[in-house]
Amino acid sequence: ISAEGTQVQLWADVFHPVVHIEVINDRPLQAEIFYENWRYQDRLIRKGEGQQCSYKWAPPKGTMTHADFISLENSSEKDSKRLLFYHRNAEETVFDVAVAQQGMNEVKSQMMNPLKNLTFGGYLSGENLEYIGTSDSVYAGTDYRAWGFRSLKASKKHHFSVVLHTEQTETVTQWEQGLKTAWQRIAPQGKISSKVVSQDKKQTRLWWNAFWQRSFIETIGETENKENSKVEKETGN
């Protein structure tokens, strides 16, 4: 994305659950980044909204979308902040309701439950970031809250990362350890390594290049026949 001399590049690592945001300009500038979330509070599922989830047209009375956990914490980098966010499924999910509804509680323990203890989320982090507070707004008829960050000083280059992690764990602490391991891979010394990011970007580009090199569609159809007919008429054949 380019505008007024600023280039913003977003790319996802195909081998690791990390999204990178790179901002480049010919002159030093400050950059801001916001994490926006409409699930910052519990929300009762209203009539007709069951279609957004597995309950469909018959959600149990009182069913709600529970709030995500969102917390500001210190990064390993001096004076820098990062945002931890995640959603952990409630003790009872649609899996439990469906099993009971079908009268299968006796064999419930034998079933694979893909929703139990499932936690997903990540870190939003960057180089030399300061926290500038929250703001509330509305998008598509739904209110949301934004957590804002700004670079501590102007620079020609800025880099932000969103490190993600999804896992079924007995405790949140175990899930957080998995997330920290994923983050430490790109920040082995407590600071995001430009060398690691550069290597990951190169490998991602090579993967996409190989993908497109093996993805061809060759067609023979009406357009080609018309072109052949045109050539025949011009040559008098």
Label every model-predicted segment.
Residues I1-N237:
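Acidic/polar, glycine-enriched structural segments that form the non-catalytic walls/loops
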